[in-house]
UniProtKB/Swiss-Prot annotation:
Name of the protein in its database record: Histidinol-phosphate aminotransferase
GO molecular function: histidinol-phosphate transaminase activity; pyridoxal phosphate binding
Pathway noted in the entry: Amino-acid biosynthesis; L-histidine biosynthesis; L-histidine from 5-phospho-alpha-D-ribose 1-diphosphate: step 7/9
Record keywords, A-Z: Amino-acid biosynthesis, Aminotransferase, Histidine biosynthesis, Pyridoxal phosphate, Transferase
Entry-annotated residues carrying N6-(pyridoxal phosphate)lysine: K202
Species: Thermotoga petrophila (strain ATCC BAA-488 / DSM 13995 / JCM 10881 / RKU-1)
BP GO annotations: L-histidine biosynthetic process
Complex and partners: Homodimer.
Cofactor(s) it depends on: pyridoxal 5'-phosphate
Reactions it catalyzes: L-histidinol phosphate + 2-oxoglutarate = 3-(imidazol-4-yl)-2-oxopropyl phosphate + L-glutamate
PROSITE patterns tied to this protein: AA_TRANSFER_CLASS_2 (PS00599)
Length: 335
């Protein structure tokens, strides 16, 4: 078979809808990166540096990430960066014999596994959304988003440790950490078979810049740096991340608003009678049967509102107050 035909059969592109509507589908931050910080980025850029292959990761950025992590047991050799958290996930699928994940989960795990031709195992979460008993061990990498995407619920520390104790490598995807406020990064003191992945896309309004980071053992970081592309994160993207971390209080205040809106929406949705999760992300998740879900999606499309559809229901990104009020109104009408 022609290699291009084989790729077309096993992999498929990640597609998004047009942005000609109220868009609450991709868990993007409703607030733009502040204009004055954009100006600061460009003031700090050195035009002469643009002509060179810039260090990735930038040592100064690693120092700022370590300060943000605020631990006393991590050093520069425990941190690296990726072209978005997605690149880190993609590379990890090349590093291990088999990838394991628990749907409903981040859809790109399956997309990436198929794209790279990796062996993978999908074992659904239990009915109460807990990690099931699964036969894994050395050679496996187990991807666990915490808070989970798309449901937003949080896995217990004991669930994560149960997988770690099997000897499998755990990729703990903390893309939504800032909206939850609790991390299991301290487990790195106890387990070498753990990597914590984070992103600047969500809380820091930098999805377009494609920058994430990974924290793990020195041994893993060395292996990851050998596998990833050289110069994988641009000079400009790294500068945006450094400026964001220098002004983290701005983003912490915005995160506080998003969390308050999330809790407000959860309270209202429960009163409306919707079955929702206890989301700790920047989104809410409503369980729905297929027929009801399709009717809701049709209703929202007619109102020029886009949300994300999953087999188990719909996920709604927390937007600005007026956007949240708009979709709450339509959900009430639909109910």
């Amino acid at each position: 078979m022609n290699p291009l035909d084989l790729i077309a059969r096993r992999a498929y592109p990640y597609e998004t809808e047009k942005r000609d509507r109220t868009y609450l589908a991709l868990n993007e931050n409703p607030f733009p990166f502040p204009e004055d910080l954009v100006d600061e980025v460009f003031r700090r850029l050195n035009s002469d540096t643009l002509k060179i292959y810039y260090d990735s990761p930038d040592e100064e950025l690693i120092e700022k990430i370590l300060s943000y992590l605020n631990t006393d047991f991590l050093s520069k050799s425990n941190v690296s960066v990726g072209n978005g958290a997605d690149e880190i996930i993609y590379v990890m699928m090349l590093m291990f014999d088999r990838s394991v994940f628990f749907p409903p989960t981040y859809s790109c795990y399956r997309i990436f596994a198929k794209a790279v031709g990796a062996k993978f195992l999908e074992v659904p979460l239990t009915k109460d959304l807990r990690i099931p008993e699964v036969n894994v061990g050395e050679g496996d990498v187990v991807f666990i988003p915490n808070p989970n995407n798309p449901t937003g619920h949080v896995f217990e520390r004991e669930e994560i440790e149960r997988i770690l104790k099997t000897g499998a490598f755990v990729a703990l995807d903390e893309a939504y950490y800032e909206f939850h406020g609790e991390s299991y990064v301290d487990l790195l003191k106890k387990y070498e078979n753990l990597a914590v992945i984070r992103t600047f896309s969500k809380a820091f309004s930098l999805a377009a810049q494609r920058i994430g980071y990974v924290v793990s053992s020195e041994k893993f970081i060395d292996a990851y740096n050998r596998m990833r592309l050289p110069f994988n994160v641009s000079y400009v993207s790294q500068m945006f991340a450094k400026v964001a971390l220098d002004h983290r209080e701005i983003f912490e205040e915005r995160t506080k608003f998003i969390v308050e809106e999330r809790e407000r929406m959860k309270s209202i949705l429960r009163k409306m009678g919707y079955r929702i999760t206890d989301s700790r992300g920047n989104f809410v998740f409503i369980f729905m049967e297929k027929e009801e879900k399709e009717r809701l999606l049709e209703h929202l499309r007619a109102k020029n509102i886009a949300v994300r559809s999953f087999r188990e229901g719909v996920r709604i990104t927390i937007g600005k107050r007026e956007e949240n009020d708009m979709i709450l109104k339509e959900l009430e009408v639909f109910k």
